[in-house]
């Protein structure tokens, strides 16, 4: 038990202490520190028991694991033997190596010599192989250059030159080859730069040309081949998209800037130019290996503007050739649409060039960022530089085509506003343009020997001319318009801006989008366009308009210059119009067209319209006053027309409203003749009452028929102008009120027109209509004033108390003059006014003359039977003249004649006549008749008797009125 306890103690001690040496030290410390021998013996006994226990346990374990232990011991013995053998072998090798070292040390000089000779021979062989390869470089280089595998050629040449200037520098036999390859290396970058420019400016744009040709073929198959605008401004799409990969890269090739410069690999089995993007990357990589990137960038910057100008020249020739092939002659047709075609082509080409530059610029940035160039701080160009040069070239082109230097305006009139007063060119402006029919040739000489030889010669000349550009077109250069060393597709002029403004504005938007400019910043081309239009074009248009209008309004008598028959026929008018009015209306239409063409400046053009119409209104007002004003005083007809009450009354009468309505549209009235007769009576009453018994002096009437004709022409012209301007302005206002669905069909919407301008335009149109109405009223009143002028003196100053003689058989001279004036007016008005207005002038005139003559009875001092006969003849001749004019019997003059025939009776007979025939005239008119009879006849009694007759007259009239009223009431009751 004690042994087991001791063993357990030591096992626990061992388990507590992982280190056996610690246990031994503990036991030794216990034995050495203990003073009692018994304790030591006890400790010793415990140790021995523990060791015995361990031996037993070990024996048991050995018995249990004998096989494994035996295998482990044998394996250990085998490993030990192998290690021992290896040590012995290593020892033997060391001894052998020491022996070899001693032997080699003895032969070291001979071995060193042989080793050096071997190295020298190997180097010589390598040099010989390299020399053989270098000798073949010129031939291989020529093959690579011919096949345009420039990257392989560059690598080959750079490697060869490095060898010749390095290891083979001392080889005298290679000096000529060294010079040759060095020279080729010095010039190779020029070839690469030239190829790069060819792809930048020719290959990139040739795709645009090819696409245009395909479009042209498609359109020629699907449309009428007759010459017409290739590009319709109204249907130009929204801003074009920049060239994408499908537009720029070759079929199956990589898209624009899809790869880095390091990824560019040259395939010797394929056409290197099949993929232009890849080919330009190869060129940049070759230039980088030649360390010519700075020279490349410099060349691109220096040649950029010149290359763009060459694109303009080639495009100009291309457009001219296209027009020539369509059978158009630029010098004859002078079509600005070809300029639009040219600009659209240039926009596409410049976009293609910009896209190509973005590719090249990306490659250049990659080359600068790598170790290919080994250059520091290489300053590249950017896309802003490209767009600036494109804008510069376009500015120069526009400067020429818009004739900003005014090289042509001094000698050539404006194509838009110039026309001769002869009328043919003037009428051509308003003529409807017939659609051009294709001109089918009857025969051609193209297959004759002369034509074949001439065509071959021209083709050879043009091939030589365009061999470098890669854009050989067909057609002679003679189709271009010469101008100061520059060739044009159309005649330069300021009006060309109207055709190209919207497409140019869209391209400017594309440029600003590409440059990332905000709304607050404009590109130079937009600034150029804005300055040109505001500072040059608008002023030039204003000057042209002023010159044209002043040419017809600043004459001595602008109201006498009429448009010719051709112009009237074209305009579809029945009566002559003032040439100045047509010029002004054409100017307004021209400005309205400009407003649509240059929609961004619509306010400026509308302001011009307002100013020109206001000026013309003032001109017409001045001319009107020059006719109707005499010595700071208006003639009576103009004064009455100006009077608001009289003019309002005249316009309220049915004859005025009937004039404004066609006869078939007038409302039908029962007893219309009585209604109109009542209106004539009201008009006559107002005019007679307004004038009174005053005599009209000659200076208060318009005696010159040409003045009346001028007023008639002014009326027709101003009314026509008012209608045309109202139509134009109504279309303008309507165009600003489109629904969203309609707006989607409008390409370039006009900006909203301010209400103030619209109000001004409407007021001007109304003013012209009011002036036209006033002219017509003056004519209407002037004819009637002439009647007053001649017929009032006839009663006041005429002698009708005459005896029967030859003199009594003649017409009164005043009546003859009045008839003459009326006939002259009729002749002038019939030629100058439309029929319904002519009728308005003369209808009702017989009623007025009848009223004047009847009212004039009170002014006769005395009248005899011969005087009555003469008066009746006067009335008859007036009636005859008016009947010939109005083509209707003037029954009102019968009424006047019957009034004077009534004076054949005595005073008492007159009263009996009233009783028998009823009341035909007013009480005042009967009183005037009785008074005149009392003055003219003898033995009719004194004043008392006369008063009795007048009283009897009143009674008769009252009785007749009562009878008439009773009859009327009876009719009503019966109904």
From Swiss-Prot:
Keywords: Acetylation, Cell projection, Coiled coil, Cytoplasm, Cytoskeleton, Exocytosis, Phosphoprotein, Protein transport, Transport. Residues 211-230 are annotated as: Disordered. The modification N6-acetyllysine is found at residue 9. Residues 32-114 form a coiled coil. Its main location: other. GO terms for biological process: membrane fission; mitotic cytokinesis; paraxial mesoderm formation; protein transmembrane transport; vesicle docking involved in exocytosis; vesicle tethering involved in exocytosis. The keyword Coiled coil applies. GO terms for molecular function: PDZ domain binding. Belongs to the SEC8 family. This is Exocyst complex component 4. It comes from Mus musculus (Mouse). The lineage of its organism: Eukaryota, Metazoa, Chordata, Craniata, Vertebrata.
């Amino acid at each position: 038990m004690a042994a087991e306890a001791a063993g357990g103690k030591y096992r626990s001690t061992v388990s507590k202490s992982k280190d056996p040496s610690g246990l031994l030290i503990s036991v030794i410390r216990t034995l050495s520190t203990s003073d009692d021998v018994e304790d030591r013996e006890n400790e010793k006994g415990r140790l021995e028991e523990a060791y015995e226990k361990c031996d037993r346990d070990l024996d048991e374990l050995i018995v249990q694991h004998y096989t494994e232990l035996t295998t482990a011991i044998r394996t250990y013995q085998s490993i030990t033997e192998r290690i021992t053998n290896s040590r012995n072998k290593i020892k033997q090798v060391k001894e052998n190596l020491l022996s070899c070292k001693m032997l080699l040390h003895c032969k070291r000089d001979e071995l060193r010599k042989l080793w050096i000779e071997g190295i020298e021979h190997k180097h010589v062989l390598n040099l010989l192989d390299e020399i053989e390869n270098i000798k073949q470089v010129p031939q291989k280089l020529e093959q690579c250059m011919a096949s345009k595998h420039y990257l392989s050629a560059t690598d080959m040449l750079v490697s060869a030159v490095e060898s010749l200037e390095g290891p083979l520098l001392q080889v005298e036999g290679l000096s000529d080859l060294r010079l040759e390859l060095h020279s080729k290396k010095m010039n190779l970058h020029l070839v690469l730069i030239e190829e790069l420019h060819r792809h930048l400016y020719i290959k990139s744009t040739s795709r645009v040309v090819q696409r245009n040709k395909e479009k042209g073929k498609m359109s020629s198959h699907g449309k009428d081949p007759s010459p017409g605008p290739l590009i319709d401004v109204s249907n130009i799409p929204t801003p074009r998209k920049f060239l994408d990969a499908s537009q720029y890269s070759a079929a199956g090739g990589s898209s624009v800037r899809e790869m880095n410069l390091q990824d560019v690999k040259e395939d010797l089995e394929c056409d290197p130019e099949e993929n232009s993007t890849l080919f330009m990357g190869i060129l940049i990589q070759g230039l980088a290996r030649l360390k010519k990137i700075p020279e490349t960038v410099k060349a691109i910057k220096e040649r950029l503007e010149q290359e763009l100008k060459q694109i303009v020249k080639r495009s100009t020739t291309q457009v001219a050739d296209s027009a020539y092939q369509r059978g158009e002659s630029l010098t004859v047709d002078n079509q600005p649409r070809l300029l639009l075609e040219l600009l659209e082509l240039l926009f596409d080409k410049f976009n293609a060039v910009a896209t190509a530059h973005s590719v090249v610029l990306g490659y250049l940035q990659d080359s600068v960022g790598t170790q290919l160039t080994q250059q520091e701080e290489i300053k590249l160009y950017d896309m802003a530089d490209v767009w600036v040069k494109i804008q510069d070239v376009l500015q120069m082109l526009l400067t020429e085509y818009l004739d900003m230097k005014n090289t042509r305006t001094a000698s050539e009139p404006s194509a838009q506003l110039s026309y001769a007063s002869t009328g043919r060119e003037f009428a051509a402006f308003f003529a409807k343009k017939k659609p051009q029919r294709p001109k089918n040739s009857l025969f051609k000489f193209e297959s004759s020997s002369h034509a074949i030889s001439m065509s071959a010669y021209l083709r050879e000349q043009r091939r030589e001319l365009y061999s470098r550009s890669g854009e050989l077109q067909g057609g002679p250069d003679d189709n271009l318009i010469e101008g100061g060393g520059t060739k044009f597709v159309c005649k330069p002029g300021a009006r060309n801006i109207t055709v190209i403004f919207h497409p140019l504005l869209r391209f400017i938007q594309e440029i600003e989008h590409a440059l990332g400019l905000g709304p607050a910043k404009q590109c130079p081309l937009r600034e150029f366009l804005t300055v040109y239009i505001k500072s040059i074009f608008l002023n030039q248009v204003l000057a042209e308009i002023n010159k044209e209008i002043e040419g017809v309004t600043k004459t001595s008598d602008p109201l006498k210059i009429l448009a010719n028959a051709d112009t009237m026929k074209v305009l579809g008018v029945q009566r002559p119009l003032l040439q100045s009015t047509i010029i002004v209306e054409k100017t307004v239409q021209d400005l309205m067209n400009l407003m649509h063409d240059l929609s961004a400046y619509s306010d400026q053009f509308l302001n011009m319209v307002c100013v020109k119409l206001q000026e013309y209104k003032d001109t017409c007002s001045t001319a009107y006053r020059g006719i109707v004003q005499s010595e700071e005083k208006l003639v009576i007809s103009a004064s009455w027309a100006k009077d608001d009450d009289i003019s309002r009354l005249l316009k309220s009468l049915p004859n005025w409203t009937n004039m404004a309505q066609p006869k078939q549209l007038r409302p039908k009235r029962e007893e219309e003749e009585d209604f109109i007769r009542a209106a004539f009576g009201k008009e006559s009453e107002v005019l007679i009452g307004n004038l009174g018994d005053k005599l009209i002096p000659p200076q208060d009437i318009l005696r010159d028929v040409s003045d009346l004709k001028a007023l008639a022409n002014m009326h027709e012209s101003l009314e026509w102008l008012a209608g045309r301007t109202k139509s134009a302005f109504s279309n303008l206002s309507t165009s600003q009120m489109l629904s969203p669905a309609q707006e989607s069909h409008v390409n370039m919407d006009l900006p909203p027109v301010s209400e103030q301008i619209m109000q001004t335009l409407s007021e001007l149109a109304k003013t012209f209509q009011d002036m036209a109405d006033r002219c017509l009223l003056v004519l209407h009143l002037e004819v009637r004033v002439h009647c007053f002028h001649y017929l009032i003196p006839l009663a006041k100053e005429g002698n009708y108390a005459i005896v029967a003689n030859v003199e009594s058989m003649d017409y009164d001279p005043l009546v003859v003059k009045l008839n003459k004036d009326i006939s002259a007016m009729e002749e002038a008005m019939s030629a100058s006014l439309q029929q319904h207005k002519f009728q308005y002038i003369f209808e009702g005139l017989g009623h007025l003359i009848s009223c004047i003559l009847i009212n004039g009875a009170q002014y006769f001092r005395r009248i005899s039977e011969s005087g009555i006969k003469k008066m009746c003849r006067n009335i008859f001749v007036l009636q005859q003249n008016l009947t010939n004019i109005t083509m209707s019997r003037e029954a009102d003059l019968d009424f006047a004649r019957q009034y004077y025939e009534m004076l054949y009776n005595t005073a008492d007979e007159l009263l009996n006549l009233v009783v028998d025939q009823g009341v035909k005239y007013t009480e005042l008119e009967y009183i005037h008749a009785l008074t005149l009879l009392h003055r003219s006849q003898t033995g009719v009694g004194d004043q008392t008797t006369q008063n009795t007759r007048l009283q009897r007259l009143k009674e008769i009239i009252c009785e007749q009125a009562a009878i008439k009223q009773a009859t009327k009431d009876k009719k009503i009751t019966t109904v």
